[in-house]
Amino acid sequence: MTFSERWVSAWNAHDVDSVLEHFHEDVVFTSPVAAMLMPESAGVVRGKPALRDYWSRALQRFLNLRFVVEAVYQGIDTIVIVYRNQDDGLVSEVLRFTGDLVIEGHGTYLVP
């Protein structure tokens, strides 16, 4: 199973612990949704515990959360997972790795 398959499977199961298994303790993650759910973060989430808090809040807010992967792009130490969310919105998750773990991530959303 590829990283993106494990990633989407964990998200669709609403299993934050399984998603977090692939993230470094010192991860930095940015997202406009984080800015909305955690205004004090200004959209920048630092560290695995804070990321757990953000994603737990997101799952409480979006009870019907579901992702369908449309495409995956791979670079040297980066992948981009393009997917549709539960609202049929197009999203790209840009994930940079150190070794086997994500050290930096960015949730980006299609601008209408």
How should these model regions be labeled?
Residues W7, V19, V27, G47, ...:
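Hydrophobic pocket/interface hotspot
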Residues A58-P112:
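A beta-strand edge to alpha-helix "cap/lid" segment located at domain peripheries
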Residues S18, H24-E70:
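A solvent-exposed, acidic/Ser-Thr-rich amphipathic alpha-helical stretch
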Residues M1-V28:
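Short acidic-aromatic low-complexity motifs
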